[in-house]
């Protein structure tokens, strides 16, 4: 048992430069990335260890955080630290090519895999919600989801508006760690956006980091700005302080017609992440402690109203989609029988990318030097010279995205290219072109690392939406391949009982041994995504597997 204190008035920042505080870069890297997750420029509520996504934490409590830091500092390169729901529980002798850290967060036996049981365990200090990259120490701020959101909006523009979103506007809500990416992604895709958020502090943070351009004073002002900017063909993002469950029905009532509707509130967690209509945030937080069941009920009732408004927009022929927060499920449980009439974003727009192992490849400069990221940007362009779409993304990212914490970059690439880039980055460290090692990781939202029937694996061709062997195999293979740290989580994105997913991070320290590990891991990891989709019968994935020489006994053998 440990002290369950989750609050500490402290500011944490990862060390910079090339001086070690641990015994090697293989242990320095997870140490810095853990600290980076709690950097006040990165985390949503770092003093309570909350990184993003409602209550997604980096460590179970402050005593556990202290002990993780202490253990990583002394860990040898033939030892592995085991972390159980944010608590360091053991160090065991392994070998130099094994992961230095293995993490399991929020996992529950299926019958008990619900918020009620999890919240009981959390209150007792026995569990921690790791979200996806919070408890796996590879969150890089809102940039981590910007490109995926951008790709979604661009593809929606191709499907519905002839390839251009100029003069169009997106209606959405939520400006937290994930939702905060939406306004910038819409702007980069060429659209205006109206972004509803119930916490002023989150709007302030997105304005400060240039993820949102302006704040409207009220709904009338917001609509006037939208009308002006769309008429001028400008892509400007507007924040509006308010509650989506109140504002969306009002927009329907007024006959307002957005060009696209989605949502990224923290609806996955009704107790901690979704403000009921008519409530203040202070009331919500206080009553969550004293009347949790009533709070959950009120939040889900508001979600039902919110989703009904989204359905009303869809009935008007407006492209409407779920952005992976499980709000449709919550509404269905509150009596909205047709909540799933509008699709999730993955089957609607992203799955063809997943079939080729393309997903949110990301890296961070442990040096803390922005120039190291700019050099890697140039290397990506050099090694992938003919992808104009990717080059445009990198140019826009450099111009518009503010680094949060350690400088980092997100770049959606797939099987073949990930290993190529990783080996090139490792060589840049070896030659001294980069001033310190880099880490390469990804979101758990990737092609082969998640089972989530209401999000990434919704409407799989063969009906295998809920089969969760795939992320388990992904984690096992990345462990065998020698990733520097590997994580296996439950409940990220869509909440308890609705997802299982795995993550990996690998260090490029410039050594020959690192190159061997990089070649294995960055081939195998996206390879499992191609495998998973080929197994489900997707022709794009089957063709990719054959082109890339994957050995899939039932398909290519």
Curated annotation (Swiss-Prot):
GO MF assignments: urocanate hydratase activity
GO CC annotation: cytoplasm
Keyword S-adenosyl-L-methionine found: no
Cofactor(s) demanded: NAD(+)
InterPro entries: Urocanase, Urocanase-like, Urocanase_C, Urocanase_central_sf, Urocanase_CS, Urocanase_N, Urocanase_Rossmann-like, Urocanase_sf
EC identifiers of the protein: 4.2.1.49
Pfam families to which the protein is assigned, alphabetical: Urocanase, Urocanase_C, Urocanase_N
Catalytic activity: 4-imidazolone-5-propanoate = trans-urocanate + H2O
BP GO terms, sorted: L-histidine catabolic process to glutamate and formamide; L-histidine catabolic process to glutamate and formate
Keywords linked to the UniProt accession: Cytoplasm, Histidine metabolism, Lyase, NAD
Location of this chain's protein in the cell: Cytoplasm
Gene3D superfamilies: Urocanase like domains, Urocanase superfamily
Residues binding NAD(+): 53-54, 131, 177-179, 197, 202, 243-244, 264-268, 274-275, 323, 493
Taxonomy, superkingdom: Bacteria
SUPFAM superfamilies: Urocanase
Active site (UniProt): 411
Cofactor note: Binds 1 NAD(+) per subunit.
Similarity field: Belongs to the urocanase family.
Role played: Catalyzes the conversion of urocanate to 4-imidazolone-5-propionate.
Matches recorded under HAMAP family: HutU
UniProt protein name: Urocanate hydratase
Natural source organism: Pseudomonas putida (strain ATCC 47054 / DSM 6125 / CFBP 8728 / NCIMB 11950 / KT2440)
Gene that this sequence comes from: hutU
């Amino acid at each position: 048992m440990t002290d369950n204190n989750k609050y500490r008035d402290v500011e944490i920042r990862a060390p910079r430069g090339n001086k070690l505080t641990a015994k090697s870069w293989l242990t320095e890297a997870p140490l810095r990335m853990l600290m980076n997750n709690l950097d006040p420029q990165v985390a949503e509520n770092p003093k309570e260890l909350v990184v993003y996504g409602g209550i997604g934490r980096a460590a179970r409590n402050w005593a556990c955080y202290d002990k993780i830091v202490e253990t990583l500092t002394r860990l040898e390169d033939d030892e592995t630290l085991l972390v159980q729901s944010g608590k360091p529980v053991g160090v065991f002798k392994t070998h130099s090519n094994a992961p230095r850290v293995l993490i399991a967060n929020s996992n529950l036996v299926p019958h008990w895999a619900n918020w009620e049981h999890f919240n009981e365990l959390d209150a007792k200090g026995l569990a921690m919600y790791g979200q996806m990259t919070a408890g796996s120490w590879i969150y890089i701020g809102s940039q981590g989801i910007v490109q995926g959101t951008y790709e979604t909006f661009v593809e929606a523009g191709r499907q519905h508006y002839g390839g251009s979103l100029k003069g169009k506007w997106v209606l959405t809500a939520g400006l937290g760690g994930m939702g905060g990416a939406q306004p910038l992604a819409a702007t980069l895709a060429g659209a205006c956006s109206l972004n509803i958020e119930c916490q002023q502090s989150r709007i302030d943070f997105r304005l400060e980091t240039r993820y949102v351009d302006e704040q409207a004073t009220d709904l009338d002002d917001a609509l006037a700005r939208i009308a002006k900017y769309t008429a001028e063909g400008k892509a400007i993002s507007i924040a509006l302080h308010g509650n989506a469950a109140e504002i969306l029905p009002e927009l329907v009532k007024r006959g307002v017609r957005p060009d696209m509707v989605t949502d990224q509130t923290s609806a996955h967690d009704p107790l901690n992440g979704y403000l009921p209509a008519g409530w203040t945030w202070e009331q919500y937080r206080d009553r969550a402690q004293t009347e949790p069941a009533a709070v959950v009920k009120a939040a889900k009732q508001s979600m039902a109203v919110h989703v009904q408004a989204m359905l009303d927009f869809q009935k008007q022929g407006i492209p409407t989609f779920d952005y992976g927060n499980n709000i449709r499920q919550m509404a269905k449980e509150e009596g909205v029988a047709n909540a799933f009439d509008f699709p999730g974003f993955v089957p609607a727009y992203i799955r063809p990318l997943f079939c080729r192992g393309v997903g949110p490849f990301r890296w961070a400069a442990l040096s803390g030097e922005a120039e190291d990221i700019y050099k890697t940007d140039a290397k990506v362009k050099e090694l992938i010279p003919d992808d104009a779409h990717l080059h445009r993304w990198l140019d826009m990212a450099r111009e518009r995205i503010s680094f949060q914490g350690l400088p980092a970059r997100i770049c959606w690439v797939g099987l073949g290219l990930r290993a190529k880039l990783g080996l090139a980055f490792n060589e840049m460290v070896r030659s001294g072109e980069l001033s310190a090692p880099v880490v390469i990781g990804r979101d758990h939202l990737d092609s082969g690392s998640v089972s989530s029937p209401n999000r990434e694996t919704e409407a799989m061709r063969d009906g295998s939406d809920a089969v969760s062997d795939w992320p388990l195999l992904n984690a096992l293979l990345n462990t065998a391949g020698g990733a520097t740290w590997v994580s296996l989580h439950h409940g990220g994105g869509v909440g308890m009982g609705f997802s299982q997913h795995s993550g990996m991070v690998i260090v490029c320290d410039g050594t020959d041994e690192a190159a061997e590990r990089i070649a294995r891991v960055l081939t195998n990891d996206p390879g499992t995504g191609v495998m998973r989709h080929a197994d489900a019968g997707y022709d794009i994935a089957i063709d990719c597997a054959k082109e890339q020489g994957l050995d899939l006994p039932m398909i290519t053998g």
